[in-house]
Regions:
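N-terminal glycine/serine-rich phosphate-binding loop of ATP-dependent small-molecule kinases
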Residues: 1-97
Length: 97
């Protein structure tokens, strides 16, 4: 099976992935939850590293479920949880305000 499409949704509480054919037949799907941190009352934040680990995890899971190679994926679509801005410093570390 070749020409597969990978859809990734980075949501508020988890990441979901779907592997499908160009005609829309779902081959595999997976999700990975991650925490919301509350550093003080009225604040909520997430660690972008959790998002990345989640993307890697669900991608590996759907590829394994479908028993396909990554080079069979010809397109990737990503949706996110709204307009989120992640500030990083020169070393690539998250800046906490």
């Amino acid at each position: 099976m070749t020409d597969l499409l990978l859809g990734i949704d980075i949501g508020t509480t988890n990441i979901k992935a779907v592997l499908a054919t160009p005609t829309g037949r779902i081959i595999a799907q997976a999700q990975n939850d991650y925490p919301i941190h509350y550093p003080q009352p009225g604040w909520a934040e997430q660690d972008p590293a959790d998002w990345w680990r989640g993307v890697v995890t669900v991608t590996r899971v759907v590829l394994a479920q479908a028993a396909v190679r990554s080079d069979q994926v010809v397109g990737i679509g990503v949706s996110g949880q709204g307009c989120a801005v992640t500030l990083i410093d020169a070393a690539g570390e998250v800046v906490h305000v």
